[in-house]
Amino acid sequence: MSGKRVLALYGALLFCFAAVVCRLYWLCSDTDYGARAAAQSVVTLHLPARRGNFYDYRGQLLTGQTTRWMALCVPGEGSYARLFAYTDAAGQATLYQKRNAASPFLLEVDRDVSALGVSCWPAARRSSAAPLAVQLLGYLDGEGHGAAGLEAAFDELLTGSGAGDTLLCTVNAQGKLRAEPVLTPADSGAVGVQLTLSREIQQTAEAVANETMQSGCILVLDTANAKVRACVSRPGYDPENISASLNAPDSPLLERAFQCYAVGSVFKPVVAAAALEAGESGFVYTCPGWCAVDGRIFRCAGGIPHGEVDLAGALEKSCNGYFIRLGQALGADAVRAMAEQLGFGQAIPLTDALHTAAGVLPEREALASSGAYANFCFGQGELLASPLQVAAMMNTIACGGICRTPLLLETTLDETTGTPLTVLSHVRSRRVLTKRTAAALQALLAGVVAGGTGHEAALPGQTAAGKTGTAQTGQFSGGTELKNYWFAGFVPAEQPRYTIVVLQDTQAEPAFSSAAIFARVAAGLEILAP
């Protein structure tokens, strides 16, 4: 090789070497590049998004009461073996799938596992092992948004921006941690929603329902303001396992307190109210156990004759014939108008997006039929109402004739400070009954419990008032008609504090009467009373 070629080769090599040196110098002095390189070694993990909670009227949590834990799984640290026993089947599947992962990941575990040398962080669990008011509150979809009930109605408020805390993990090429993870809190802007429910009263009613009913609901209203203190529907469901209940024949997702049902004799106080307002309190009827209307026979329960009964006796014995004849004396317009004033046939708004079923208040034209009107007078036929409508009616009697729309919402809350933000509902009231009529009805309904069909609602040491109802549904099982069993009333009878409605729907023969269930709830309320 000639000398010129050797010099050229050496020159080329020298040039390449100089270029490499210059490039290295530039890389070392370029801070932006260094930052970008560092960023490439940081893994960002997202903790579950924070969601606003529901609170009772005293500010106690109804959701988010329990804690779940998110454990950090790091490659090469034996996460599979250490955490397998502390997570559920889905978590175990995740561990298996990511057993050879090249970067850290988060895994939900059932406890704080920091004692195992594993970093973990708490996050609120939406539902507890014994969730409250599940049909009312609703549930979340797979993306964490409200899919039913109040969760859906307030989804935008509760979700906020949807942001959650982030975990910054600096790792090496093998995915192992180079430094302690850094938790970066996020402010999603989500707010809480305060309801009128009482957590203690709700828990009491839930416990009674669990012990006594298969299908139905329990409502408790604060008589003074018609605020809903408890709203229980049975059967229940697991908000974290919706698929198990979607096709269940007993409809566990249904909020029964807001649906409409045949009401039966629990409607008779409405007819009694119309009579008292019209000055017909002295009406007397001799009951042979049945009543003929244009050739059609309407029987009292079991066809049992009640003999001569006045308004008090007819309510105590729940005499169908008496109320048919009383209704005929009053006229359909008067009875229907009273029912309308007491809220029948009208949906009760709970939120902008949630309201009860309106039910069915038969039109005047329908009640022109003597048979249809006879049925109407003792709560049968086309008449349908929701348990909350029945509660509003009974509450009107209990609070002296003032009809107040039942309320479910209080305010939105700043969850950090507990400060109320926006009032969500206001008391709406109007006088429907005179004080004299309401007082007379209170005494009459106290008689139903003291010596009538509602005797199982009686409490030792405390008075109660109310009305039973057994409504035909037209549905049969094994040749036996299924019925709706009601009790609606208030405690104490003299100075009512709570209005309680119990419904057991589409049952052949329930294990407990609705009056007995009412008594259990009332006894629980007495224990809770300060």
Predicted features and spans:
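Beta-lactam-recognizing serine transpeptidase/beta-lactamase-like catalytic domain environment
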Residues: T63, D222-S265, V270-Q504, P530
